[in-house]
């Protein structure tokens, strides 16, 4: 029974998504329906957490805009998610970056991972 559920979840998972980790800055493009029209909306932020696995995996992004911190969660395997692009790789030593919530300005930044390790990641 467990194998059947795993096979069904593997069928529903998308394979076109790029690999990213917590601390990376990514750009997520989603389809938005407004008044009978569809458009693509882009949200760029730092990955705070990845939760779940398989078809129900979610990612939480954090961004500071106009002095206010905002968070948005995305279901990775949703058909509304058009694309995910890695802007820069971050160097962190935590699996969850919830300490970014109260920070603004330079304190809310994550160090950038540069060099050959950034390309391998």
Curated annotation (Swiss-Prot):
SUPFAM superfamilies: Translation proteins SH3-like domain (SSF50104). InterPro entries: Ribosomal_bL19, Ribosomal_bL19_CS, Ribosomal_bL19_sf, Translation_prot_SH3-like_sf. It comes from the Bacteria. GO terms for cellular component: cytosolic large ribosomal subunit. Gene3D superfamilies: 2.30.30.790. One of its GO terms (biological process) is translation. It holds the Pfam family Ribosomal_L19. Keywords: Ribonucleoprotein, Ribosomal protein. One of its GO terms (molecular function) is structural constituent of ribosome. PROSITE patterns: RIBOSOMAL_L19. This protein is located at the 30S-50S ribosomal subunit interface and may play a role in the structure and function of the aminoacyl-tRNA binding site. Belongs to the bacterial ribosomal protein bL19 family. This is Large ribosomal subunit protein bL19.
């Amino acid at each position: 029974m467990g194998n059947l559920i795993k096979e069904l979840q593997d069928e529903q998972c998308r394979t076109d998504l790029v690999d990213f980790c917590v601390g990376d800055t990514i750009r997520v493009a989603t389809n938005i329906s407004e008044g009978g029209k569809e458009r693509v909306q882009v949200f760029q932020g730092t990955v705070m957490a990845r939760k779940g696995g398989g078809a129900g995996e979610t990612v939480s992004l954090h961004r500071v805009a106009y002095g206010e911190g905002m968070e948005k969660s995305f279901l990775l395997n949703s058909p509304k998610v058009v694309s995910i692009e890695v802007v820069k790789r971050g160097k962190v030593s935590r699996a969850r970056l919830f300490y970014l919530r109260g920070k603004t300005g330079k304190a809310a930044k994550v160090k950038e991972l540069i060099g050959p390790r950034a390309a391998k990641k």
